[in-house]
Every structure is written in structure tokens, then in C-alpha cells.
Amino acid sequence: MILRPRQEESVTKCIDALNTKGNTLLVAATGYGKTVVTSDIIGKMKSDKTLVIQHRDELTNQNLGTFNKINPSIPTSIVNGDNKDYSGNAIFTMAQTMSREKNLWNLPPIDLCVIDEAHHAASDSYLKIIEHARTLNPKMKVFGVTATPNRGDGKTLGTIWNNCADQVHIGELIMSG
């Protein structure tokens, strides 16, 4: 897969922010290709262990498939109701699955935690995973991607992310064709 120039720009901005500022958020409109951008970022970060968290099973499989197309040489694994495989350099899971005590205690130290649909991250299940993973590696970075950074319940994402590396609005996508 070849990224578009604007996607390459997002990748560069996000990697720079992760390396210099720590926890980083990418806000991009629906249709931008956030999964492709995120997969490229993970591949270029070259972390020993990355945990990729989704909120739905369909997204777990979709994100895993896209990741494997972009990064065919990076070993992946999945932790879900049927599989408990933590061996991959990139581990894909749902928040509801990983937040269970039995699954959390098997989690290896993570260097990069990626949260798809990051507006969900202020919920208890996500915070439980982040807090546990941070006890295993206090230097773990958290990268989030979302089209909608605002939550209806008023909880802020600022407790997790201290900066937003890039924002891509729908108007920009329309103008670029």
C-alpha cells in the first residue's frame, strides 16, 4: 500500500510527536485512512511490543488485516475470546477482552499502546489496561486515533494524551479530492 502525501505528513508528525512529546493523538475525519496511517506509524516506530486496542471485534480483524498488508514482516498475534496469543510484536485485541484480569496478567511489557477510536479511551476498561501496561513499562507511549475527540459524557482525553500531533478535517479531504 502506498500512502498519499497528506498521510505521509501525518505519519511524520505523529512519529516526531511520539518521540519528543510522548503520548500523542491523531484526529482525522472519516475516510482519511486512519488505519493505514496507524499501521505505517507502528511499523516505523519499531517497538519491541505494540498493543493495538479496538472497541469492536470487526475492527480488530480489519485493523489486523490492514497492518499485515503494510507490515508483512512484523509478527502479529491476537487476543480475543478464542485466541490468547501474546507472542507477536504487534498484539491486536478488544478493550473488553484485554481488561479482564486473566488477560491483563498475561500481558507482556508494552512499548507502544495504540488505541483505535481513541474517544473511547477515557472509559474504565481502557484506563485499566493503560494503567496496568504502564506498571509493566513506565516509559510506554500511548498513541490514539479518532475522528471524534469529544465525548458525550464530558470525560476528557487530556488525562491520556498531552498533545495532538495532527488534525485532518473533512474540508481538507474534500479539497484534496
Name what the model sees in each region.
Residues 95, 117-119:
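Conserved Walker B
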